[in-house]
Amino acid sequence: MKPLSLLLAVASALGTAVSAGPAVIECWMVEDAGGGRLAKKPAALLLRQGPGTPPPRPDLEPELYLKVHDPAGTLQAAVRRYPSDAPPPHCELSRFIPLPASARWARGLTPGRSCPRALDGAWLMASVLSPIFSLSCLLRPQSEPQPEPALFTSATAVLTVLTYSPIAQIQLGQDALLDLRFAYMPSISEAAASLAPGPPPFGLEWRRQHLGKGHLLLAATPGLHEQMPAAQDGAVAFAAWDDDDPWGPWTGNGTLWLPAVQPFQEGTYLATVHLPYLQGQVALELSVQKPPKISLTPAPLVWAAPGEAPPELLCLVSRFYPAKGLEVEWELRGGPEGSFQKAEGQSWLSALRHHSDGSVSLSAHLQPIPVTAKHHGARYACRVHHPTLPTLGRSAEVTLEVAGLSGPSLEDSVGLFLSAFLLLGLIKALGWVAASRSTSKDPKEKKAQ
């Protein structure tokens, strides 16, 4: 049993290591180089390490090799969920300057317009993008001296804004839930400057950008009783701190709920969390979709005489979204050339028909070529490809019957039997009625004699 226990322990350790996500996130430090140009330098976020000092990175400047301390654990929790076989996330670092919120509705967060001296010093904003999560993390490098030569820089994650739904695909007419969570842990100097225990006031802002236009969707400052702009499109946000621990760290929720999503609500959603003089923002992409319904007429059979063309086939592709990306193919299955081939004939598409819910419909037409006896039993199929459908698409089909080659089917045989049975019963009934009438007339005739 000991070897088995050891094997299970090793397997468990390997599973934990695989699911723990990357220990280092490679980044680019992006700065303004003047003249409308940007300068980029390699950087890295060290999230976990083994015993001892961090592994050396001679390819990085020490101030851009950041050993991150995450008191709230939000950044670490997000990275642990990252699949080991997924491409590495995209990460950028930039300089950040603490400033009061510029929006009028958020001015209650910062009664004093000057930034406290406790926030002086260098700040960095890390933006990490991936299909799994999207986050922004406000980092404060530590100023403690290190032994020469310095190999890395320690930094604390002060404010982390995170979403686990960076790409949301919502069915047309259904509700959308755009995930947003955030965590805050003030640095030592901030905590010393603030005498009030408990989480600070915060502001939540959701904006939508689409086709070059943007507008405020929802704004909230819980507990400040400020005059807020009216929410748009029925949007509701769960804006609150999750706990009220006196000294932090604190986590909060800013998830947005949109009822019965329509196509006009597609676009980029910007979620911003405002703290006094600090901000964090993430972007989410929302797209609306609806798979098409497909019907083919005439169905289920189409008739034609040898040498004649079958009647026109109509494939109705109804109630789908988006309108782009739709393709219709006509196939002939089981024909004389083999089990599968492209159907010959003249084909065309109708114009789009728009519906009140934002979905669209169109019809595809095919006028097949004249058929021969070899086409008997073949099937015409209308195959539709659309971004909302699987790779092979979706199809509907009808069976071709060539006149003069079809024997009676089982249904026809049953129908003929039932017809004959009813006819025989009818004849017997008429004979019984006639016999009854003749019998009733005989006694009357005898009395008359």
UniProtKB/Swiss-Prot annotation:
Cited Pfam families: C1-set
Disulfide bridge partners, by residue number: 27-91, 315-382
Spans traversing the lipid bilayer: 414-434
Lumenal side: 21-413
Family annotation (InterPro entries): Ig-like_dom (IPR007110), Ig-like_dom_sf (IPR036179), Ig-like_fold (IPR013783), Ig/MHC_CS (IPR003006), Ig_C1-set (IPR003597), Immune_Resp_Modulators (IPR050380), Tapasin (IPR008056)
Site (May be involved in interaction with TAP): 428
Gene3D superfamilies, A to Z: Immunoglobulins
PROSITE patterns in UniProt: IG_LIKE, IG_MHC
Compartments where located: Endoplasmic reticulum membrane
GO molecular function, one term: TAP complex binding
Membrane topology, as annotated: Single-pass type I membrane protein
Key words of the record: Disulfide bond, Endoplasmic reticulum, Glycoprotein, Immunoglobulin domain, Membrane, Signal, Transmembrane, Transmembrane helix
Recorded domain comment: The N-terminus is required for efficient association with MHC class I molecule and for a stable interaction between MHC I and calreticulin. Binding to TAP is mediated by the C-terminal region.
Protein name (record): Tapasin
Lineage: Eukaryota, Metazoa, Chordata, Craniata, Vertebrata
